[in-house]
Amino acid sequence: ACALTAALSGKPVLAEEWGGCTAPPGEPSQTWRWTALAGEREQFMASEEDLAVYVAQVLPRLVAAGATGALLWCFADYDESLHGTPPLTAFRHERHFGLVRPDGTLKPHAEAVRAFAATSPRVRRVDWTGLLDVTPDEYYRAPAEHAVRLYERYLRRGA
């Protein structure tokens, strides 16, 4: 997504509001299902350890893609005293997106961020213009038609 956005805009890209919601500490990855707002809800909840692996894999790839930074969503899980209040009643998974648990301890993916930062990664501009085989105007007229092909092209490039 960063490479495509950079290629279409010709501007640097910041990856923001990414990450994942986690299952309770010590529990494996799982799928939660519940009913809210007259509809069935389903959400994958990564184990804390699995999300740490994911974050550790994504951060260097963002650097390689030329992203100027990465803002994970979000700082801390909601305190349990707030779980019964809107919007957390309908969107249960939103309670658990934090880098920090309600008790103030860091989740493993926060440690993955710390370890990555310790490598002193350098932001570098990557020219993605060669990725496109259509103009931005052509792309935006039919994004679903172009996105899969351009992603496959990106993968063949060896990114």
Task: Locate predicted features.
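The substrate-binding groove and active-site-proximal loops of carbohydrate-active enzymes
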Residues: 1, 37-52, 96-105, 112
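Glycoside hydrolase catalytic-domain groove-lining segments
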Residues: 1-39, 56-59, 68, 77
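Amphipathic, alpha-helical segments enriched in basic
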Residues: 33, 37, 42-45, 84-88, ...
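Aromatic side chains
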Residues: 50, 54, 73-75
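A generic structural signal for well-ordered alpha-helical surface patches
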Residues: 53-56, 60, 111
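Residue-level recognition of short, well-ordered coil/turn positions
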Residues: 66-67, 121
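Aromatic-rich peripheral "rim/lid" segments of glycoside hydrolase catalytic domains that contact
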Residues: 73-159
